[in-house]
Amino acid sequence: MTAAPAPLGNVSPVWRRAWHPVAHAEEITADRPARVEVAGQAWAVTRLDNRLVAFDDQCPHRLAPLSAGGVSTAADGAARLTCAYHGWRYDADGRCDLIPSLGRDGNISERARLRPAYGVSEAYGLVWLAPLEPLAPLPAFPEWDSPGMTRARSRTVRTRASAGQLVDNFLDAAHFPFVHAASFGVADEGPLAAGSVTTAGWQVTGLFDTPYRDGGVVVSHRVIKTAGAHGSAHVRLELPGVTIGILLGCQPESADATRVFKLITRDDIGGDAGRLAAFVKEEDQILAEDLAILERYPSGLLPLDPRAEVHTRADRLSVAWRKLLASASAEVLVERGPAVA
């Protein structure tokens, strides 16, 4: 008998095989490293000679946090990451080129090398990090660069809700009339239309139509949601006269902390600063409404075993995503090998 998949938490091994947003681009500077966490592991991220780099936040000498150090300039003019404890210095490839206590002619061990993240990249105004080779590519956000779209970002928050819970909630539509009654939910919505759910590779997509309350007016809108083997999800909302694109990016920092990035776009604002501010405020409110429920859960663990909960047809998209994450988790477990008692 196949063992039931373990619940998904913020430090589950599968998150090490995924891209995660870890900072706004302007938060990563060239003068000092920033400390970020992914799945319980700390990384030092900085820019060396216009190159974005991320290393395990430990100097191999005495395991001091590199993020406590700074960026210095070598004799050749190149930028170097420097440990604050004993001054060991590293180039953009993680190679140590100076140990002050040995002098400039000292013999530096090949082991004096930093461990890099598999990948670090910049997209949509965010810095993304993949600790190990990711199963899925960076999440797509086509509206971000679409002509006529006004781009903004919602307030970045830290929450005790897990990345899995946040994405699962983002994919769900049956909670709109209840959780979002004060924003866009329609109280007498009725049964949720079945829509369609498809899985292709490491991505699930759901398409359905639901009512949407825009101020005092209720209109029908088409919802297209996608999520993959990572802690991010995308939605495209098509309403009469307006298209909205949203990317929810979750950084699973530790077992009980997640940083939430929410990027938003719409094509009917133009240069109207007042309408843009109102749009951002509404999206902030929607996230706050979701967190008011999610943060009341006693645990951040998301069941991946379908037998752990009772599902209906309205849950098809989130169930498909959980199945995908269960498959991804199983693949990562096979690569790691079974636990040794």
Task: Label each residue range with its predicted role.
Residues 1-8, 41-43, 80-91, 165-167, ...:
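A broad, low-specificity signal for short, low-complexity segments enriched in glycine/proline
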Residues 2-8, 14, 21-146, 341:
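Rieske [2Fe-2S] iron-sulfur-binding domain
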Residues 63, 135-341:
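C-terminal catalytic domain of Rieske-type non-heme iron oxygenases
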Residues 19, 31-35, 42-43, 117, ...:
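Short, acidic/polar N-cap/turn motifs at the starts of alpha helices
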Residues 14-17, 243:
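Short coil-to-beta-strand transition motifs
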